[in-house]
């Protein structure tokens, strides 16, 4: 059975894919994120004892436009992919379906802590102090699982990691841009992702593989450690992506000299612009930091 066939078989057995009356079933508590393709809000789910959930509603026209890029390739939907991701460091997807307006809807675990994006942009050191190594390991393990399942996430960035309360743990979210790691989906031309964290091969419309995620992961970890971008410095906008293969990144130890050098070295190897010089798989990154116990050395 092919990867896509196995995904669809598991999805059918989950009972997902039906109609979801968003306005009747959920009581919105607050809007969490308004993205380029979808809106995400926290709500009480009346069908499940008013438990708090995250609800993602994808804009229909943007969804159709994105999916049209893969016409004829039998691409699994975001819902089909997300339902198959069962890992302690990935936010669980409870159900997927379509709203009464035909919009794709995903109902997922509510993770109560701050987003890594807010922590990094607002330089909230108290959330990360003494916890970076642990959180980075959990992030790496979640990405390793995605890769072992046969996918490329394609949007690894701080916005797509949410901390648990008190930043004791972290979870990966959002499979809206995720694609199978198979030849038809790795051909040049699909330039999607978050520009500040986008690998040169995506920017330049070259062939891709799972190493695009490793680059984005490396940039994300770098920003976690020093609250600066390896190329741009201050995290302001996506234009820095144009420099990802035209100038070298600033060495992490220059900006964070007390960071454990083994962790710093692993992060710098992950974000190398040249694919052949980059960490080849996330398991190698985990191996490189296996003995790192503390964020900083005396």
Predicted segments, located by residue:
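Conserved short submotifs of the Hanks-type protein kinase catalytic core
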Residues: 101-115
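Protein kinase catalytic-loop region centered on the HRD/HxD motif
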Residues: 141-151
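AlphaC helix of the protein kinase catalytic domain
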Residues: 116-127
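Activation segment signature within eukaryotic-like protein kinase domains
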Residues: 135-136
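Short beta-strand micro-motifs within the conserved protein kinase catalytic domain, predominantly
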Residues: 92-104
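AlphaC helix of the eukaryotic protein kinase fold
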Residues: 64-84
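Conserved activation segment of eukaryotic-like protein kinases, specifically the C-terminal portion
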Residues: 188-201
């Amino acid at each position: 059975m092919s990867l896509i066939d196995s995904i669809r078989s598991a999805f059918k057995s989950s009972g997902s894919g039906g109609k979801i009356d968003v306005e009747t079933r959920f009581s919105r508590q607050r809007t969490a994120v308004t993205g380029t393709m979808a809106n995400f809000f926290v709500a009480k789910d009346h069908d499940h004892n008013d438990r708090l959930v995250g609800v993602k509603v994808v804009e229909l026209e943007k969804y159709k436009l994105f999916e049209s890029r893969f016409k004829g390739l039998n691409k699994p939907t975001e819902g089909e992919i997300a339902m198959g991701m069962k890992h302690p460091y990935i936010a669980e997807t409870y159900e997927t379906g379509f709203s009464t307006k035909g919009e794709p809807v995903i109902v997922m675990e509510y993770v109560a802590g701050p987003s890594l994006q807010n922590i990094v942009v607002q330089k909230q050191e108290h959330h990360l102090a003494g916890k970076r190594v642990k959180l980075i390991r959990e992030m790496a393990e979640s990405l390793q699982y995605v890769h072992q399942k046969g996918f490329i996430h394609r949007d690894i960035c701080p916005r797509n990691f949410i901390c648990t309360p008190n930043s004791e743990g972290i979870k990966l979210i959002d499979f809206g841009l995720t694609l199978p790691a198979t030849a038809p989906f790795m051909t040049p031309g699909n330039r999607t992702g978050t520009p500040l964290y986008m690998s040169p091969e995506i920017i330049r419309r070259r062939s891709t593989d799972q190493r695009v995620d490793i680059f984005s992961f490396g940039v994300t970890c770098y920003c976690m450690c020093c609250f600066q971008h390896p190329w741009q410095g201050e995290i302001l906008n996506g234009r820095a992506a144009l420099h990802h293969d035209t100038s070298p990144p600033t060495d992490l130890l220059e900006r964070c000299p007390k960071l454990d050098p083994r962790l710093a070295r692993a992060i710098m190897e992950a974000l190398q612009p040249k694919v052949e010089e980059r960490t080849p798989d996330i398991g190698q990154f985990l191996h490189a930091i296996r003995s790192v116990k503390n964020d900083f050395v005396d």
